[in-house]
Regions:
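Catalytic center-proximal scaffold of phosphoryl-transfer enzymes
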Residues: 1-141
Length: 141
């Protein structure tokens, strides 16, 4: 998993305090081992930051829709459900009753069901293999 978030650094040499910098986060997958979370500070959001950090990485990379991750060779991008849900929620008109015929509302409700299912599975099982098996059983139904 990868994500980047803006931040301001005060008293950084040769940069104004209002200048936007970025903290990049890289997290290992849920493969049964202990999670590894690494952070990288950068003055920019350039996709080369991800390329440099993930040099030699091959596999699935869960991230948001930022195009900078497209530069990472040998990475198969996967979307983050929380980001997709946020995009759908942003597309729903505010201050009005939900229109259940709208794709954005239907998508948000479907993702809510996925999140609920994941909570149920994780409350019952703690090992990666058991969680994976339960997910696959639910998928086949």
């Amino acid at each position: 998993m990868a994500d980047e978030t803006p931040l301001q650094v005060l008293h950084e040499p040769e940069r104004r305090a209002q200048t936007k910098s970025y903290m990049w986060l890289f997290r290992s997958g849920e493969d049964g081992g202990p999670p590894i979370i690494l952070y990288k500070y950068s003055e920019t959001r350039a996709g080369d930051n991800a390329v440099d950090f993930l040099h030699g990485f091959k596999g699935y990379l869960m991230c948001d829709g930022y195009s900078g991750y497209n530069k990472v060779p040998d990475a198969k991008r996967t979307a983050c459900w929380a980001h997709i849900r946020r995009y759908l929620t942003d597309a729903i008109p505010k201050g009005k009753a939900l229109d259940y015929t709208q794709p954005s509302v239907q998508g948000m409700l479907y993702i809510n069901q996925l999140f609920h299912l994941e909570d149920v599975i994780r409350s019952k099982y703690s090992s990666f293999d058991a969680i994976k098996k339960a997910r696959l059983e639910k998928k086949s139904r």
